[in-house]
Amino acid sequence: MSSWGDSLKISVFGESHGKGIGVVIDGLPAGVRLDMEGIYLQMSRRAPGKDKTATPRLEKDIPQVLSGLLDNTTTGAPLCAVIENTNTRSGDYGNIMSCPRPGHADYTGNIRYGGFNDISGGGHFSGRLTAPIVFAGSVCRQILAEKGIRIAAHIASIGNVNDIRFDPVDIPSELIDRLNVSTFALIDQSAEEKMRAEVEQCRMNLDSIGGTVECAVTGLPAGVGSPMFYGIEGVISSIVFGIPAVKGIEFGAGFDAAKMKGSQDNDEFYYDGDTVRTRTNNHGGILGGISSGMPVIFRAALKPTPSIGKQQNTVDLVKHQDAKLEIHGRHDPCIVPRAVPVIESAAAVAVANLMMQVNKL
């Protein structure tokens, strides 16, 4: 299924080398005026071909809205947007039609769909399909901003090079403003040179590298979410895992909480005026699947781009024998910088859906 959500539902369609890709967003409130330039800005942060850390495939990624918008204002009808694919080179994939690429969905997709799936550029499994997610998320984050809810993410790490983490109890609006327009989003900008060097070394060695993205949601009121299976962690995780390359996620202190004592992990409450807050935020803004009013913080791990220039071992599904494979085409040596606005957008869609569930949006 390429559809997600209940109160707010998105359906992503298209393939990497097809005529276009897009998304249908169903359940948006009517009468919301959208800043299209703001949406184009977020699309450009994800768009390929603009940085050495990214694929040289150049796409403008300008969404064409087909329905649900009149004079830049939502009508209440499903909002449908299409993004044209203008720079495809399917010939680069001729040698992989019968030889699945290690780390890709070529083999599993072949088995699942009986060999009828389009593998050019990764087909429907491609990271290109994150562009519609960014469009949907850009719409949602504008609606959330009217409620005082803001979302920002940054590159937490590339390889062994780390950025500093968000202050879990106090994320300044000035930092959110800066990260929201950055194409190489870092809290400590001095880490950029080392991160770029790490990526460049992999690129020169015909290899790739992964990393992590940290995301924060501020302004989410207490009381949003549900227990057990529809808690905030589950809702956010379910859409974040729809992003190709994401292999793990943690909230708050995450796996570090497993090393703590209860007296260390527990976040003590106090009154800040009339507002209940916690002095620490190991719980990442979520208790029992429900928001506490503190910033919601999570980190997602992204594996290295599987398409690399090194010769690799695979199999030939037609000849039923082992084979060697050299991958051609244009690929990201590191997907992490471009994944930042995608993670933000996935969080925005998830939070909008959660807010609608409790009639707060």
Positions of PLM-derived features:
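Glycine-rich, mobile lid/loop segments that gate access to catalytic sites or pores
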Residues: 112-228
